[in-house]
Amino acid sequence: MSIITDVYAREVLDSRGNPTLEVEVYTESGAFGRGMVPSGASTGEHEAVELRDGDKARYGGLGTQKAVDNVNNVIAEHIIGFDVRDQQGIDRAMIALDGTPNKGKLGANAILGVSIAVARAAADYLEVPLYSYLGGFNTKVLPTPMMNIINGGSHSDAPIAFQEFMIVPAGAPTFKEALRWGAEIFHALKKILKERGLETAVGDEGGFAPRFNGTEDGVETIIKAIEAAGYVPGKDVFIGLDCASSEFYDAERKVYDYTKFEGEGAAVRTAAEQIDYLEELVNKYPIITIEDGMDENDWDGWKALTERLGGKVQLVGDDFFVTNTAYLEKGIAEHAANSILIKVNQIGTLTETFDAIEMAKEAGYTAVVSHRSGETEDSTIADIAVATNAGQIKTGSLSRTDRIAKYNQLLRIEDQLGEVAEYRGLKSFYNLKK
């Protein structure tokens, strides 16, 4: 009765109006699962391949019909007949069927859509919530959210090099309260921006994209919003930055060129100067987490940054690790970073995603479950965050339904768990020594 009888993919749109995949899986019993695949704007060069059609006459070349066809005409016939509860077996079968190290033949988007749909169908078959199916009886930790309320870099037209300025309500007693705090700060920030005559249009991830006078102006304005909402920076609410440094790193000159986003007169920093600058920010502001502070291929820079700041602040590898255990294993061995960002479409299956989270935890690294800038109404990452007791999640600002869908799912999960639910706040940053 739990045998897969049908697999079907279709092309749908993501939050940027670009095509992506939606996959449905059916079983003999009538159990059903649907998965939708996100897409990134600033992507690491080592990520699994997102298969696009390349036909400029259709969606500007971004169509996903090839990936859809790979699901319907290749993958389907290989996994029909599997027990839907055999997640690892199905994921491994798809990896073998693709046969490439980066899923470039079938497309990571095709494989991931099936992987998510299989998990959802299994949960439906067993009549349990997805987080419970994936995590088992010890599922209980609601993640501390990192809310991207200022969008810069490749996520907006704002002239700021850093891609994300986040608030982290780690001092809240529950996830529900953390979400309320974040929403109140978001609205306080909007009021401050209006008073300054700055833009309140939002970027890809729902954060504002104003024309700040550099990084410090952005951070200081957020601190004012935290205080205006009635909270204490560095006690109730902390700051997080996603530098996305690979987006403005000049590999030929080996410098971090802020002029790419901030224009003439902006800083151009060597790796050593980049580390010095990040240290200045950490010493000046209540920053608790920095993502991709160095370029994805600057291993020496990452090691130096970790040696300098690794005990004070969370250093998250996104483009640096691309949710890949091979890169993470190297990072652990070389003491580079102390946290990994988890993006399901960087690696392409739930099995490999869970492997990366497990490896990180065993090494004392934190794992931050994350959305992509091109999202859908699919809320699977909320369930993954709770299922793995990851303790941290990045899923955008307090606007745009594609972001709010994940927050609302976490509210439901917290409500369902009842007294068992734990919100660990600062304790979720167990990689810090201070």
UniProtKB/Swiss-Prot annotation:
Listed name of the protein: Enolase
E.C. number: 4.2.1.11
GO molecular function: magnesium ion binding; phosphopyruvate hydratase activity
Organism name: Streptococcus thermophilus (strain ATCC BAA-491 / LMD-9)
Keywords: Cytoplasm, Glycolysis, Lyase, Magnesium, Metal-binding, Secreted
Organismal lineage: Bacteria, Bacillati, Bacillota, Bacilli, Lactobacillales
Gene for this chain: eno
GO cellular component labels: cell surface; extracellular region; peptidoglycan-based cell wall; phosphopyruvate hydratase complex
Main function: Catalyzes the reversible conversion of 2-phosphoglycerate (2-PG) into phosphoenolpyruvate (PEP). It is essential for the degradation of carbohydrates via glycolysis.
Highest taxon of source: Bacteria
